[in-house]
Amino acid sequence: MKLLKNLGWFLLALLSFLFIYGFIQVLATTSLALGASPYAVTLLYVALAGVYVYVIYKWYQKAPVHIEKSGFNRFIWLPALVWFLSLVVQFFLPNDPSVNQQIATDLTLAQPLFSFFAVVIFAPLTEELIFRGMLARYLFPKQDNSKQTLLFLLVSSVLFALIHSPGTLQQFLVYASLGFSLGLAYISRKGLIYSISLHALNNLVSFLMILML
């Protein structure tokens, strides 16, 4: 019964991400497409998205997550290494951008100021809060052994990949590997700072590559 209740709460958090934060994004991008000032739209977006992040973060803080020491979180450098290796592997894969990546590319080229805040700042904040923080808080609050932690990492990685709308197996694996490294970052520090920072670094690299190439 408690598991079903917690599942319901997590789904509510997920729906808030999809519909409330999604509405904020659509409102901003539609306004830009209609010719509104990029500065005004970005300012409004930062304000609305900031309120959403604050509310979800306060919600996340209401209950602790217990994570025991294991092979998955023993080394603080492991998440960064996994992320770096997955990044290197992508350079040798065929160019196969997902719909989500293509949208991000087009948005970055058309509206770099807005895109910086959307992609580099708020995407890491919102996605880490939901797919690491709220997932752990409600469905994996007591990770007492390696099996529970591994299950959290796998579920987190799969959900993270699916939310980015992969159209091929390669796209799914790219997002899942990123999600796995971010999950490792979350459990290694038993909090969101590391995973948000690593996620922001990943998106910053992509953002700069789009602008420079």
What are the language-model segments listed below?
Residues 5-13, 97, 135-139:
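Membrane-associated alpha-helix detector
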Residues 32-38, 61-123, 141, 211:
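Juxtamembrane helix-loop-helix connectors linking adjacent transmembrane helices
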